């Protein structure tokens, strides 16, 4: 067996070697000192192995009647939804293991990918998930992949098909990740399938269950299959090639949204390396679509890889090339001027979604879909060669027009008001967190502060006032996942200096670690983990795990202080930036600046989807983690 994978198995599967108390022999490489340390750190759960530190050694473990401690697996009090969430939160790896396995994935990509996919296929076999299903739409990307999936789902649902949508992360509730026909699944369905999967996986894997992200992926696949969903749309978690969602050998169609720099510790430091990881979702003979905004370094990789695996690639057209019927036939059509999701950047995502939906429709055998594609234009499209062009699908189907208009996606260019609790306050939320997405978010914010109006509520009427010097502008920002806040903040400060946007009367950096222990653990783990590792362990995670990944932080007492330092350095302290103990307190500060509703306030919340989710939770007055 390959030593790298054996080391990986030792780290995550120590209890399996003790099963039935039989002796075993293992071979480890020169980096086995890490395994020694890992065992010592976890001596409450594992018997210590007497590894040596020579370059290569063979060790036989002693026979003993000791078994793994019972705390290796969560013991639920009941089979409720709340206990399902509690159990789910234990399926996360400690930081030491995450860092080690992240390095293995980066340094040994081919072997790691084979191992991860084989492991995922085994999990699916245990849960009787049919991987030969072909009704899958699979989408990767750096920016806009979630929005693309949401628009695609909306279009297909408007045509009358049942849909299953799996996305990540969630904003408030883990149920958001799994949606049927546009609605997140109920607590009853969540708990039913969670415990069903739990029992089946424990039977085959004892305490070695899939980690947080993988478990939810498996749950989603099981639900969509057993509920007989006609179309499944899967958003990649991180990358593509090694992602848990990449387990289907023959999806119906795949897509890659705009690419940029994110998760470099896993995917690589160049755009070409990142693009190659994303291209890993391409399959032989399966159409692949991407957007025209890809930079040359990225698109060249996508083209080369599509030719290599014989996955026909098509670059989607600009959305303004499509027309929609105005009721007078093909000779009386209109351009698409706007869609349900705000921000001009969503138009590119919409064009990608249109192509994915059209391809999915074309490949169906249902009678009503065949009747849809009965025109000579539609018949010209061949998904085997993916000769996609606008003329084949113009004017667009009515379902596509409705799907574009009716799509909603929380936390992305979202305008929120709650006059009863926050009078005269407008909240603008966008989960942008990369350098590229910060520029897109900024363009959206410019359109708001320069052309829109602010809502003013009185005791009797609601009117609108044009933006003026009396409007207070507030920024609530934080950065997670070890990302450099300076990169994100730079275009914002430059726009202020260039007088393209108003100065922020106050910028607030809240601590986004929720005070409740269950929320706190969730936020820390999601920030440092996502789906980086494969198998879970219940070793406790340090409270400061998420903030100790950047050496620069050591100069500041907290991560929030560090972000303030970055902000002050960029702005030369020309406008105030402060920290807040919590998201709740940052909202209260904003409310106080409005003089409790007597002044108009516009609040921009950005930098992290976790921050956006926390703010939405406060604004919606949902105090419990549900």
From Swiss-Prot:
GO terms for biological process: one-carbon metabolic process; tetrahydrofolylpolyglutamate biosynthetic process. The keyword Nucleotide-binding applies. Pathway: Cofactor biosynthesis; tetrahydrofolylpolyglutamate biosynthesis. GO terms for molecular function: ATP binding; metal ion binding; tetrahydrofolylpolyglutamate synthase activity. GO terms for cellular component: cytoplasm; cytosol; mitochondrion. Keywords: ATP-binding, Ligase, Magnesium, Metal-binding, Nucleotide-binding, One-carbon metabolism. Its EC number is 6.3.2.17. The keyword tRNA processing does not apply. It catalyses: (6S)-5,6,7,8-tetrahydrofolyl-(gamma-L-Glu)(n) + L-glutamate + ATP = (6S)-5,6,7,8-tetrahydrofolyl-(gamma-L-Glu)(n+1) + ADP + phosphate + H(+). InterPro entries: Folylpolyglutamate_synth, Folylpolyglutamate_synth_CS, Mur-like_cat_sf, Mur_ligase_C_dom_sf. PROSITE patterns: FOLYLPOLYGLU_SYNT_1. Mg(2+) 2 binds at residue 263. ATP binds at residues 144-147, 412, 430. Mg(2+) 1 binds at residues 168, 235. Belongs to the folylpolyglutamate synthase family. Conversion of folates to polyglutamate derivatives. This is Putative folylpolyglutamate synthase. The lineage of its organism: Eukaryota, Amoebozoa, Evosea, Eumycetozoa, Dictyostelia.
């Amino acid at each position: 067996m390959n030593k790298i994978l054996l080391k990986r198995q030792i780290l995550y599967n120590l209890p399996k070697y003790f099963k039935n108390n039989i002796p075993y022999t293992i071979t480890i490489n020169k980096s086995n000192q890490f395994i020694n340390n890992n065992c010592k750190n976890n001596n409450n759960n594992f018997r210590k192995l007497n590894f040596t530190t020579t370059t290569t050694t063979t060790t036989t473990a002693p026979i003993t009647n000791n078994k793994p401690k019972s705390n290796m697996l969560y013991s639920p009090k009941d089979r409720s939804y709340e206990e399902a969430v509690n159990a789910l939160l234990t399926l996360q790896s400690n930081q030491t293991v995450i860092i080690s396995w992240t390095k293995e994935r980066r340094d040994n990509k081919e072997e790691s990918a084979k191992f991860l996919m084989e492991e995922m296929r085994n999990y699916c076999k245990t849960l009787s998930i049919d991987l030969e299903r072909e009704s899958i739409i699979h989408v990767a990307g750096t920016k806009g992949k979630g929005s693309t999936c949401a628009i695609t789902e909306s279009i297909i649902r408007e045509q009358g098909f049942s849909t299953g949508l799996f996305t990540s992360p969630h904003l408030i509730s883990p149920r958001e990740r799994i949606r049927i026909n546009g609605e997140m699944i109920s607590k009853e369905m969540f708990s039913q399938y969670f415990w069903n999967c739990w029992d089946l996986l424990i039977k085959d894997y004892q305490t070695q269950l899939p980690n947080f992200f993988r478990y939810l992926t498996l749950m989603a696949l099981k639900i969509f299959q057993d509920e007989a969903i006609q179309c499944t749309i899967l958003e990649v978690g991180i990358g593509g090639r090694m992602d848990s969602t990449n387990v289907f050998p023959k999806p119906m169609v795949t897509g890659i949204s705009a690419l940029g720099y994110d998760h470099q510790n896993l995917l690589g430091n160049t755009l070409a390396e990142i693009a190659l990881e994303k291209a890993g979702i391409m399959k032989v003979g399966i159409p692949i679509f991407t957007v025209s905004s890809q930079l040359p370094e990225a698109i060249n990789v996508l083209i080369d890889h599509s030719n290599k695996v014989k996955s026909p690639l098509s670059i989607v057209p600009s959305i303004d090339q499509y027309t929609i019927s105005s009721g007078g036939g093909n000779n009386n059509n209109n351009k698409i001027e706007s869609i349900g999701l705000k921000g001009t950047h969503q138009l590119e995502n919409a064009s990608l979604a249109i192509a994915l939906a059209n391809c999915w429709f074309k490949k169906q055998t249902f009678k009503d879909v065949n009747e849809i594609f009965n025109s000579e234009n539609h018949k010209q499209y061949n998904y085997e060669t993916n000769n996609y062009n606008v003329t084949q699908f113009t004017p667009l189907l009515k379902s596509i027009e409705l799907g574009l208009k009716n799509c909603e996606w929380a936390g992305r260019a979202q305008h929120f008001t709650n006059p009863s609790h926050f009078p005269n306050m407008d909240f603008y939320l966008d989960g942008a967190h990369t350098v590229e997405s910060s520029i897109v978010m900024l363009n959206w914010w410019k359109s708001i502060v320069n052309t829109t109006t602010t809502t003013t509520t009185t005791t009797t009427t609601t009117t609108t006032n044009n933006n003026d010097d009396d409007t207070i502008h507030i920024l609530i920002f934080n950065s997670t996942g070890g990302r450099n806040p300076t990169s994100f903040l730079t275009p914002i400060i430059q726009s202020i200096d260039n007088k393209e946007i108003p100065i922020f009367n106050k910028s607030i950096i809240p601590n986004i670690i929720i005070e409740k222990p269950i929320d706190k653990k969730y936020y820390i783990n999601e920030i440092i983990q996502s789906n980086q590792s494969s198998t879970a362990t219940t070793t406790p995670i340090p409270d400061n795990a998420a903030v100790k990944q950047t050496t620069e932080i050591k100069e500041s007492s907290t991560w929030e202080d560090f972000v303030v330092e970055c902000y002050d350095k960029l702005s030369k302290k020309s406008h105030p930036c402060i920290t807040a103990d919590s998201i709740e307190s940052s909202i209260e500060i904003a409310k106080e600046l409005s003089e409790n509703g007597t002044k108009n306030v516009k609040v921009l919340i950005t930098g992290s989807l976790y921050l956006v989710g926390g703010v939405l939770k406060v604004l919606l007055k949902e105090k419990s983690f549900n």
